[in-house]
Amino acid sequence: MSEAGRAAWLAWKLKTFGDEKSIWHDGLGVEQVTRLRGAARADALTMLRQGLALGDVHAARALAAMDDPDAAAAVRVALDRSEGNERVWLAVTLHQQRPEPALAGHLIAVLQTINPMQPWGFGRVDAAIGLRHFAGRDDEAALLAAVADAHYLVRYHACESLISRWKITPTSIAAHPDIFAEIRDDVGDHALARERLRARARRPLSA
């Protein structure tokens, strides 16, 4: 693609979704394009396909949210090539459009991949959050294991996702002080926290 085409895509992306820092901090506002109709939608699809051709995973996620059949195959290629939080939210977006439990495997892979330079990051927290949108046994097991993760933010969001999946009330882990006390610190009894979560949801310990 020409430099002019690349520049046009980047300018449109900035105008539509904000800069990269805003997208990282606030998330990709796919509603900016999913709400469009008629010619405006067609124009957005054209620009997003252009972004996808440039390898922009944000374009892939927006196209997935718009449920664009013409880009479906290319979006899947983008998913397989993506990493970290971008892989997480592209998989979640696809699942939200058409439930596909196997997509949880992408989130599990991110959750279980530790970057020595940033052990809690590289999408691991996002994966713990994103798994609340699934309901399979393998992804439940991955979240339960993450309750004992070495890093607090992963533990916290794994608990929050299990609470959401199991429909436990109150809906915040901080509102369950006997569990929160065990995951708040690295020296807490994380196995006990896991058992108490299961008990709160009346889930058998062998499940």
State what each model feature region is.
Residues M1-D70, V77-V88, H95-R124, A174-F180, ...:
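Extended repeat-based scaffolds of very large eukaryotic assembly and lipid-transport proteins
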Residues D56-V77, R87-V88, L131-H151, R155-H157:
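Internal alpha-helical scaffold/solenoid segments in large eukaryotic proteins
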Residues D126-P204:
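Extended alpha-helical scaffolding segments
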